[in-house]
Amino acid sequence: FPTDDDDKIVGGYTCAANSIPYQVSLNSGSHFCGGSLINSQWVVSAAHCYKSRIQVRLGEHNIDVLEGNEQFINAAKIITHPNFNGNTLDNDIMLIKLSSPATLNSRVATVSLPRSCAAAGTECLISGWGNTKSSGSSYPSLLQCLKAPVLSDSSCKSSYPGQITGNMICVGFLEGGKDSCQGDSGGPVVCNGQLQGIVSWGYGCAQKNKPGVYTKVCNYVNWIQQTIAAN
């Protein structure tokens, strides 16, 4: 069964401070998921991250210390995909409307939606404050980054027989060792400047032949645009 890939990067590196200006932290008393700023008033995350009350934290690097660039904005609307399946994690995407627009600057900025889907082999940047250990747990204060390629559909499906839908992509390394993990859920996979994935699920973290599975954002551009227009 899928286990929520919900909190941290294994085998990555500490991102340069504020170098991922579209990365947000979803907070409900503490960090619980990531997200991506797609316009000044909307964030995209994973539907399995849903909570009824969410504070969006932007401009973060060290989530445990006030460093001066943060913006904390409560969610006004939280909209999960109407066809989200909590068992299979199909359609694992959610939109959050901020109660007021974020102030955009060098440390808080939007990421583009995909203009087309990403080909296998495309290198992407995954980021988050999730667990940094594949066994045991260690949650970082500083945002972690990982460069990883989009895997072919065939290797993705052979890693997870019967569990990969057309709305999922695998990104990572079949040899293991580098992956997103618990606490990274909802966060971005950005390839060539476009948001191509949302951290969704996986079997453990950084295990051999069990790469991370991500929501295939290119399938949802119309839904995102229509939902924003209607809300």
Swiss-Prot record:
GO CC field: extracellular space
Cofactor notes: Binds 1 Ca(2+) ion per subunit.
Chain ranges of the Peptidase S1 domain: 9-229
Catalytic reaction equation(s): Preferential cleavage: Arg-|-Xaa, Lys-|-Xaa
InterPro entries: Peptidase_S1_PA (IPR009003), Peptidase_S1_PA_chymotrypsin (IPR043504), Peptidase_S1A (IPR001314), Serine_Proteases_S1 (IPR050127), Trypsin_dom (IPR001254), TRYPSIN_HIS (IPR018114), TRYPSIN_SER (IPR033116)
Gene source species: Sus scrofa (Pig)
Stated family: Belongs to the peptidase S1 family.
Cofactors (names): Ca(2+)
Keyword Phosphoprotein: no
Gene Ontology biological process terms, A to Z: digestion; proteolysis
Protein's recorded name: Trypsin
One of the Pfam families matching this protein, by short name: Trypsin
Subcellular location: Secreted, Extracellular space
Keyword Phosphoprotein attached: no
